Amino acid sequence: MAGNEEKLLDYLKRVTADLRQTQRRLRDVESAGHEPVAIVGMSCRFPGGVRSPEELWELVATERDAVSELPTDRNWDLDRLFHPDPEHPGTSYAREGGFIDDPAGFDAAFFGISPREALGMAPQQRLALEASWEAIEHAGIDPESLRGSRTGTFIGCDHLDYCSDASQVPEGSAGYFTIGNSASVVSGRVAYTLGLEGAAVTVDTACSSSLVAMHLACQAIRQGECDTALAGGVAVMSSTAPFIGFSELRGLAPDGRSKAFSANSDGMTLAEGVGVLLLERLSDARQSGHRVLAVIRGSAVNQDGASNGLTAPNGPAQQRVIRQALTNARLTPSDVDAVEAHGTGTTLGDPIEAQALLATYGQDRAEDRPLWLGSIKSNIGHAQMAAGAAGVIKMVMAMRHGVLPASLHIDAPTPHVDWNAGDVHLLTEAREWPQGERPRRAGVSSFGISGTNAHLILEQVPEEVAGAARGGEAEPVAVVGDGTTPEEPVAAAADGTTPEEPVAAAADGTTPEEPVAVVGAVEGEPVGGPVPWVVSARGTEALRDQARALADRVTADPEVTPAEVGWSLLRSRTLFDHRAVVIGQNRQELVAGLEALAAGEPHPALVHPAQATDTPDTSGQTVFLFSGQGSQRPGMGAGLYHRFPAFTEAFD
């Protein structure tokens, strides 16, 4: 009997151990499915000359209006396009919008793309490629280190109107035009060029494309389909078709201003841009020591279904997608402080969205913690497939600065909303964003004209992660400028024509807004020994441009220390063949060396300046190196020198 009891006891112990192990595995699986996704890098181009997340933040923080007149460099017949009568066919009653600078500029040589192929590439493909490279560098990661990795590419993009018919195909681009004008290839082009082997997916759900792309990227990361992912969206108006089409729908604001949730709202502002994020699991970011800008706690996507119309917003569907995102994030509505709204400024869509927010986030809130509501479309317009990315980047920067920026053009809240139905307030002026007892959190909404809705919830970086980069050392600094300049103009203009004087617009990298001081932050103060800054590029002129950009960056931000810059240049950027090294004891010496390199002049702080000055390029010549050690036998080099006149003559 005793033996049977012992056997039963052993059996029960084994079963209990197996049960506990199974429970642990289930918890691990469930935890992985809800693990926050870290945003470790960001890049963007938006109206107002914005070329980085920091510049986008400066634009919204200073309450700038980036809307401008229709561009004159896209071969558009502006006189024929504009007509004040909305009933006039084939015209636009709006003549302003949000446009990025130089959409035709592209450094094809940097990416190993031939001039002919570049001519056949739509601007969306070029911008997505540049922005993806920049996002990786912004994370302090060498893009070449991701080659062959399980990195996914999820890019929102719709129909490419680079060339609407065969007569507009740029001369010399035959054989490349079909692929270069395919939206499906936008993500594939990035993956191919950078050697990324995760899923490459182009998302087209209209205005919600970039947020849907981020949702899919988060799912792929949590399910283990990829380890890291690029996610975002891109939109460029190469033709006047969007203005004509939305004028026919009466969807544009006559004065070109999106007045989100305002009593005088009268339509949206068409805009363009690109925004890309680099994402990875929060646990992986911790382990790798990557700087985390913010985390994505949860997200959701749904569809309007059968509603009042194909393009009409559906309030109940918007409420459902918000609640689904909160469930995915394991949060309640009162846990979220603010929402970056879809808010385009239309008289139909804005009231429906506001009522959905009032019914969800506006309920059961503390009296002193209303939901704050804003829209970046009041600054830059509706960037279409990149709109969600713009909203996410804005809110990430707002979290890091502790400020909720104001929305523009709100004289009074729209009377078509019952604002007493919940505790939601418009951001008519900038407000401090206190952290309180919990991290800052924000929702971001995007609703597509296709009926596809997306909502994403951002959270401030956990404190234990914020200071954990590189074992508690300074965060890496990505320095502006990728050091590339094409030797020959290769890019066609946004409308398919070749510009007379194309300007190269190389990927320009960015810098974190809060660098951590290490040593030598004071102007002219010694940094504890010589500090080397390794500058590299693909060509001689590009090397000068890189030096100039770096000098400007360091001069503009004295808080960035020489040690941080040196570390970042050496460890987090690709080292190209054309290189120079600036060595200095302090910031003044280092900047002086950079300025000399940019000017093509010698300087005591500049090492190996020959390839960066006006001396002939000697790259590719064979060099014999005699180390003095004798690779086969002692004194081998000396013996060759003394015995063979040919070696003696060549060596001397």
Walk through the language-model features, giving the residues of each.
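Short, solvent-exposed alpha-helical surface patches in well-structured domains
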Residues: 58, 356, 542-545, 592, ...
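Alpha-helix boundary recognition
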Residues: 61, 101, 222, 247, ...
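Condensing-enzyme catalytic core of the thiolase-fold
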Residues: 2-477
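Flexible catalytic loop/linker elements that gate and position reactive groups at enzyme active sites
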Residues: 2-16, 45, 313-328, 443-495, ...
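Helix-rich "cap/lid" substructures immediately adjacent to catalytic or cofactor-binding pockets
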Residues: 186-187, 608-652
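Acyltransferase
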Residues: 298-299, 303-309, 592-596, 602, ...
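A non-catalytic, amphipathic alpha-helix used as a structural packing/dimerization or gating element
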Residues: 14, 127, 131, 545, ...
